[in-house]
């Protein structure tokens, strides 16, 4: 018989740098999960992606065991990394922070394709372009 799910916890944690401190500790502690076991396993799985923020979906079962799925980093994080900027524009319609090429958009869209709700790579590219525009990043035609 399948285990009964007690909770699903969604977090965004820096790759390879999970600690029992907030936000991880309190989110898992309230469900009685062994926090150190999660931290160790998450850091081992994401060590190769250092510097990126990784969304993780933790499924907690009634017997306090857990499983988790790591997803691809958010599009905004990938765009900031591609452009080498720290923060996006506070006023995206007035102040632009950089330009991104269609090739870079395609690369990011291909990387995120499995997590996006898009039927084609073109649709995924349009989603990434929308994220870029909302961050104050110009998309080269």
Curated annotation (Swiss-Prot):
Can you tell me which family this protein belongs to? Answer: Belongs to the universal ribosomal protein uL11 family.
One GO term (biological process): translation
The identity of this protein, by name, is Large ribosomal subunit protein uL11
Q: Which InterPro entries does the UniProt record give?
A: Ribosomal_uL11 (IPR000911), Ribosomal_uL11_bac-typ (IPR006519), Ribosomal_uL11_C (IPR020783), Ribosomal_uL11_C_sf (IPR036769), Ribosomal_uL11_CS (IPR020785), Ribosomal_uL11_N (IPR020784), Ribosomal_uL11_N_sf (IPR036796)
Which Pfam families does the record cross-reference, listed alphabetically?
Ribosomal_L11, Ribosomal_L11_N
Q: Which GO terms describe its cellular component?
A: cytosolic large ribosomal subunit
Keyword Transcription regulation applies? no
Primary role: Forms part of the ribosomal stalk which helps the ribosome interact with GTP-bound translation factors.
Which proteins does it associate with, and in what oligomeric form?
A: Part of the ribosomal stalk of the 50S ribosomal subunit. Interacts with L10 and the large rRNA to form the base of the stalk. L10 forms an elongated spine to which L12 dimers bind in a sequential fashion forming a multimeric L10(L12)X complex.
Q: Does the keyword tRNA-binding apply?
A: no
Supply the PANTHER family for this chain: 60S RIBOSOMAL PROTEIN L12 (PTHR11661), LARGE RIBOSOMAL SUBUNIT PROTEIN UL11M (PTHR11661:SF1)
Named from the GO MF annotations, one term is: large ribosomal subunit rRNA binding
Q: Describe how it is modified after translation.
A: One or more lysine residues are methylated.
The alphabetized UniProt keywords are: Methylation, Ribonucleoprotein, Ribosomal protein, RNA-binding, rRNA-binding
């Amino acid at each position: 018989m399948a285990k009964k799910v007690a909770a699903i916890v969604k977090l965004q944690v820096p790759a390879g740098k999970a600690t029992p401190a907030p936000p991880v500790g309190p989110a898992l502690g309230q469900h009685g999960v062994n926090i150190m076991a999660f931290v160790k396993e998450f850091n081992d799985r994401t060590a190769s992606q250092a510097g990126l923020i990784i969304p993780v979906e933790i499924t907690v079962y009634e017997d306090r065991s857990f499983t988790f799925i790591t997803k691809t980093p958010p599009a905004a994080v990938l765009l900031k990394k591609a452009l080498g900027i720290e923060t996006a524009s506070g006023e995206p319609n007035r102040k632009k922070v950089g330009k991104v090429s269609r090739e870079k958009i395609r690369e990011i869209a291909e990387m995120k394709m499995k997590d996006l709700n898009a039927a084609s790579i073109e649709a995924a590219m349009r989603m990434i372009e929308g994220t870029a525009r909302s961050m104050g990043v110009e998309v080269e035609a």
